[in-house]
């Protein structure tokens, strides 16, 4: 009994941290809350806005710099906002906040970002110096803005589908509504 033989049949070793495919940081990251199309669109928004920002940062000189600076601000903001929304959707933070508010915020942020990014790309087209970095930034900017607007249209379509499912069918007869009450 001095060697602890009494406790050996019932004592189990501590298994330690979980090992497997969903351990560590991957356990907190879940992409399944978004449908496949929306996941692809969010990823493209993130990538294209980052590429537009990087290409714009490569520009070393400009003649009319207002369009360049506005495009820089918008492309960086679009990247950060799309990253923020993606983090909210893919982490446990999504369950801690009201999901309708997350979806509503995503809806309006995506619309606003798409419109402002399109405007910034149009302004940058009219003020650029025709260097290859500027042209690449403009192309990525236009494609990114279209991805934001396509994501907005997808969300709008999903909202309409949800409202159609929630709307009860009108089962009352039209002729019953026109009959007099005292007849």
From Swiss-Prot:
Can you tell which superkingdom this protein's organism belongs to? Eukaryota
Ranges of the Extracellular topological domain: 61-67, 128-134
According to the UniProt record, list the residues that bear N-acetylmethionine. Answer: 1
Its placement in the membrane is given as: Multi-pass membrane protein
Task: Provide this UniProt record's keywords sorted from A to Z.
Answer: Acetylation, Cell membrane, Endosome, Membrane, Phosphoprotein, Transmembrane, Transmembrane helix, Transport
Q: Please name one Pfam family that this protein belongs to.
A: MARVEL
GO CC annotations, alphabetized: azurophil granule membrane; early endosome membrane; membrane; plasma membrane; recycling endosome membrane; specific granule membrane
Keyword Cell membrane among record annotations: yes
Name the PROSITE patterns on file. MARVEL (PS51225)
- The chain's Cytoplasmic topological domains, given as residue ranges, are 1-39, 89-106, 156-183
* Subcellular location, record wording: Cell membrane; Early endosome membrane; Recycling endosome membrane
Which residues in this protein are found as Phosphoserine? 8
Summed up, the tissue specificity of this protein is: Expressed in the leukocytes, placenta and testis.
Job of this protein: Master regulator of recycling and plasma membrane expression of PD-L1/CD274, an immune inhibitory ligand critical for immune tolerance to self and antitumor immunity. Associates with both constitutive and IFNG-induced PD-L1/CD274 at recycling endosomes, where it protects PD-L1/CD274 from being targeted for lysosomal degradation, likely by preventing its STUB1-mediated ubiquitination. May stabilize PD-L1/CD274 expression on antigen presenting cells and potentiates inhibitory signaling by PDCD1/CD279, its receptor on T-cells, ultimately triggering T-cell anergy.
Q: Which family does it belong to?
A: Belongs to the chemokine-like factor family.
Q: How does it assemble?
A: Interacts with PD-L1/CD274 (via transmembrane domain); the interaction is direct. Interacts with CMTM4. Interacts with CD58, ARG1, ENO1 and TMPO.
User: What protein is this chain from?
Assistant: CKLF-like MARVEL transmembrane domain-containing protein 6
Gene name tied to this protein: CMTM6
């Amino acid at each position: 009994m001095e060697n602890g033989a009494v406790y050996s049949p019932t004592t189990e070793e501590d298994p330690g941290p979980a090992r497997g495919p969903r351990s560590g940081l991957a356990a907190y990251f879940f992409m399944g809350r978004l449908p496949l199309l929306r996941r692809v669109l969010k990823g493209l928004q993130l990538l294209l806005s980052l590429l537009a920002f990087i290409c714009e940062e490569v520009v070393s000189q400009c003649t009319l710099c207002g369009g360049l600076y506005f495009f820089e601000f918008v492309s960086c903001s679009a990247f950060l906002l799309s990253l923020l929304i993606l983090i909210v959707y893919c982490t446990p933070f999504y369950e801690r906040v009201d999901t309708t508010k997350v979806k509503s915020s995503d809806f309006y942020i995506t619309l606003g970002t798409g419109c402002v990014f399109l405007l910034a790309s149009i302004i940058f087209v009219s003020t650029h110096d025709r260097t290859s970095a500027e042209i690449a930034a403009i192309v990525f900017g236009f494609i990114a803005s279209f991805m934001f607007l396509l994501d907005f249209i997808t969300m709008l379509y999903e909202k309409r589908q949800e409202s159609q499912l929630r709307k009860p069918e009108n089962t009352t007869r039209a002729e019953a509504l026109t009959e007099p009450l005292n007849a």
